[in-house]
Amino acid sequence: SSTLKFELPYSINTLFKLLQDAAKVFASAGFDIEIVEKHHNQKLDAPSGTALALADSMKEVLEDDYFYRYDRSQLRQKRDPKEIGISAVRGGTIVGEHEVIFAGEDEVIEFKHTAHSKAVFAKGAVEAAKFLAGKPAGMYDMRDVIAAKN
């Protein structure tokens, strides 16, 4: 079953697919998965919806026993190999930064997206509106918008 993703930037939607492909390879090779997200100091939710959507996209292709770990501050135990760690940073005027880390033995692979302005969200919204014009009522997401452009 697929989770609907309403993230508007094309880049984030492309990242969903890249992470699914990477998660299949690296999780089975024993890599740990971590997400670190950063936003401005006025943001109320933590972790962000985008961080959760990134985690959800990977969890869709992983074994059912993977779970999210939001806080390790009270734990005194080794990291569970089936956890996806999600950490949130809030400070300054950071528009949005999401980093997904696959940490293995003697190597680390990182995927990172940084939004320098909210314009990337507006561009995606405009493309989505153009796509929806004249479409019958139904459930769509940005994957439909991207597929229509290819």
Question: How would you name each of these model-derived features?
Answer:
Residues 14, 18-30, 46:
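Rossmann-like NAD(P)H-binding beta-loop-alpha module
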Residues 30-150:
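C-terminal substrate-binding/catalytic lobe of Rossmann-fold NAD(P)-dependent oxidoreductases
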Residues 7-9, 13:
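Active-site capping/gating segments
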Residues 1-4:
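Conserved small/polar residues in nucleotide/adenosyl-binding loops
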